[in-house]
Regions:
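Glycine-/small-residue-enriched transmembrane alpha-helix faces in small-molecule transporters
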Residues: 1-37, 71, 78-79, 128, ...
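Specific transmembrane alpha-helical segments of multi-pass solute transporters/efflux pumps
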Residues: 51-96, 105, 125-128, 132, ...
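Specific alpha-helical transmembrane segments that line the substrate/conduction pathway
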Residues: 37-48, 81-114, 152, 230-249
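Transmembrane alpha-helical segments that form core, pore/gating elements
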Residues: 14, 50, 103-105, 138-191, ...
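Cytoplasmic-side transmembrane-helix entry/capping segments in multi-pass membrane proteins
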Residues: 10-11, 62-72, 113-126, 145-146, ...
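Transmembrane alpha-helical core positions of polytopic small-molecule transporters
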Residues: 17-21, 46, 69-77, 81, ...
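Hydrophobic transmembrane alpha-helices of multi-pass small-molecule transport proteins
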Residues: 50, 73, 115-135, 182-185, ...
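Helix-helix packing/entry segments at the starts of transmembrane helices
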Residues: 78, 92-99, 163-181, 210-249
Length: 254
């Protein structure tokens, strides 16, 4: 029964991660919103939805404020959005979670975790997928966008590693969103001349933040203490496939 609950939680988290790729691409592809405004609204709506966790843990809240975690979350969210302007859903997810896989496997090895044959295969597949996208002659995405998505993946890996500390998942995630939001807003204001949005862009941003990000990231922080870095990274390799399946399903129904 416990295993079934764990599998369900992991499945929900991975589906939400894939949904974020799809929602971000939908918002940016049609020019509904600029990436910095998308990131700011995504983080702000997530912070708002998660704020009750901070009140519930008011007595221990101070220890949950970890500025570096908030910074990593902001870097991931902003670069993820900016990169998706010129990347399709599948390629973006592959670059993101391929970088996550690489970084978290390296961290796990340094921490003494073992690399099984299955996990090694996952790492090889991730690196091969990135190489296939970036090698000369391949139908490669713009290098600048690809590099931004890779850095976003490294930031997400760092954010995930810090989540293994095992403190109250809801309050920790809420604090991270609150810390990340003003940093993203500052960037958005800095480039406000390039800013634009319509109703669809705002709706997709809020849906990404309040639903696909807030709840999923709490769930992910709940899972991380029981997962090794290598296992956590391997699980996330399912996200590019789920994202591409979501796009395919949407395309088949239009």
């Amino acid at each position: 029964m416990a295993n079934c609950a764990l599998i369900l939680k992991i499945s929900l988290a991975m589906l939400a991660f894939a949904a974020n790729s799809i929602l971000c691409r939908l918002a940016l592809q049609g020019g509904h919103i600029d990436p910095l405004s998308f990131s700011s609204l995504r983080l702000a709506s997530g912070a708002l939805v998660l704020s009750p966790f901070l009140f519930y843990h008011a007595k221990t809240t101070l220890s949950l404020w970890r500025p570096l975690s908030g910074f990593y979350l902001m870097v991931y969210a902003v670069l993820f959005s900016v990169a998706y302007i010129h990347l399709d859903t599948g390629a973006g997810a592959l670059l993101l979670f391929g970088a996550v896989q690489f970084a978290m496997v390296i961290h796990g090895l340094f921490k003494g975790e073992s690399l099984s044959v299955m996990r090694a295969c996952g790492l090889v597949i991730a690196l091969a997928g990135i190489a296939a996208l970036l090698l000369p002659g391949a139908k490669a995405p713009p290098l600048y966008s690809a590099l931004m998505m890779i850095v976003a993946g490294l930031a997400w890996a760092a954010y995930s590693v810090r989540g293994r500390a095992g403190q109250a998942a809801g309050a920790s995630t809420a604090a991270n969103f609150v810390l990340a939001t003003p940093m993203a807003l500052a960037l958005s204001l800095l480039f406000m001349k390039q800013g634009h949005y319509d109703a669809a862009g705002i709706a997709l941003s809020l849906l990404s933040g309040a639903a696909a990000s807030a709840g999923a990231y709490v769930l992910w922080y709940t899972l991380l203490p029981s997962l090794g870095s290598i296992t956590a990274s391997t699980l996330q390799l399912s996200v590019p496939c789920l994202a591409m399946l979501g796009v395919w399903y949407s395309w088949m129904n239009h």
